[in-house]
Amino acid sequence: MRIGVLGFQGGVYEHVYMLKKSFHELGINGKVLIVKKPQQLHDLDGIIIPGGESTTISILARKTNVLELLREKIVEGLPVMGVCAGAIMLAKEVVDQVVGETKQPLLGVMDIAVTRNYFGRQRESFELDIVLDELDDKPFRAVFIRAPAITKYWGATKPIGIINYNGEKVVVAARENNKLALSFHPELTSDTRIHRYFIEKIIKK
């Protein structure tokens, strides 16, 4: 099994570590590749788009000709996990909590609408225990950093993680077939359950 991590920005090496740890725990002979060129997208079984700054990642992915090929691969069925900025890139609709509609180049492959910086800027980062459908009943310690929220979903997309925030129910994790979008950063914990879920339930399905 070969899983790529888009390597332009964000928690790239944290995801590499968590994938290797997950492979070990699952007894899988797997390889993790950092992807920065179009040719590195071939022969992958899955890819993670890490957090960071979504506009920067999108622009770099477009300049290196990775964006279009990655879009094609995902549409063809390549399993993908988008984390924070990665979830923004997957979304078909994106607005910013402060500036409104954004014009950044997106993959636009998942039937979700995302609001950037939904919970505020850096000072409003927080951690929260959440229970995720399809995982197990044990809470997952979710780390939110300038996080987006999934404000709308349609088609085959289903929410798998919902939190209460300011008296409202907010979707922070969703899945649509081969696509997994997360508002929070699972790579910033020692808990590999989400990475293992991506490997076992989405890639190996």
Swiss-Prot record:
<dbReference type="InterPro" id="IPR029062">
    <property type="entry name" value="Class_I_gatase-like"/>
</dbReference>
<feature type="binding site">
    <location>
        <position position="116"/>
    </location>
    <ligand>
        <name>L-glutamine</name>
    </ligand>
</feature>
<dbReference type="GO" id="GO:0005829">
    <property type="term" value="C:cytosol"/>
</dbReference>
<dbReference type="Pfam" id="PF01174">
    <property type="entry name" value="SNO"/>
</dbReference>
<keyword id="KW-0663">Pyridoxal phosphate</keyword>
<comment type="pathway">
    <text>Cofactor biosynthesis; pyridoxal 5'-phosphate biosynthesis.</text>
</comment>
<keyword id="KW-0315">Glutamine amidotransferase</keyword>
<comment type="subunit">
    <text>In the presence of PdxS, forms a dodecamer of heterodimers. Only shows activity in the heterodimer.</text>
</comment>
<dbReference type="GO" id="GO:1903600">
    <property type="term" value="C:glutaminase complex"/>
</dbReference>
<comment type="similarity">
    <text>Belongs to the glutaminase PdxT/SNO family.</text>
</comment>
<dbReference type="GO" id="GO:0036381">
    <property type="term" value="F:pyridoxal 5'-phosphate synthase (glutamine hydrolysing) activity"/>
</dbReference>
<comment type="function">
    <text>Catalyzes the hydrolysis of glutamine to glutamate and ammonia as part of the biosynthesis of pyridoxal 5'-phosphate. The resulting ammonia molecule is channeled to the active site of PdxS.</text>
</comment>
<dbReference type="InterPro" id="IPR021196">
    <property type="entry name" value="PdxT/SNO_CS"/>
</dbReference>
<dbReference type="GO" id="GO:0004359">
    <property type="term" value="F:glutaminase activity"/>
</dbReference>
<dbReference type="GO" id="GO:0042823">
    <property type="term" value="P:pyridoxal phosphate biosynthetic process"/>
</dbReference>
<feature type="active site" description="Nucleophile">
    <location>
        <position position="84"/>
    </location>
</feature>
<keyword id="KW-0378">Hydrolase</keyword>
<dbReference type="InterPro" id="IPR002161">
    <property type="entry name" value="PdxT/SNO"/>
</dbReference>
<feature type="active site" description="Charge relay system">
    <location>
        <position position="185"/>
    </location>
</feature>
<feature type="binding site">
    <location>
        <begin position="145"/>
        <end position="146"/>
    </location>
    <ligand>
        <name>L-glutamine</name>
    </ligand>
</feature>
<protein>
    <recommendedName>
        <fullName>Pyridoxal 5'-phosphate synthase subunit PdxT</fullName>
        <ecNumber>4.3.3.6</ecNumber>
        <ecNumber>3.5.1.2</ecNumber>
    </recommendedName>
</protein>
<feature type="active site" description="Charge relay system">
    <location>
        <position position="187"/>
    </location>
</feature>
<dbReference type="GO" id="GO:0008614">
    <property type="term" value="P:pyridoxine metabolic process"/>
</dbReference>
<feature type="binding site">
    <location>
        <begin position="52"/>
        <end position="54"/>
    </location>
    <ligand>
        <name>L-glutamine</name>
    </ligand>
</feature>
<keyword id="KW-0456">Lyase</keyword>
<dbReference type="GO" id="GO:0006543">
    <property type="term" value="P:glutamine catabolic process"/>
</dbReference>
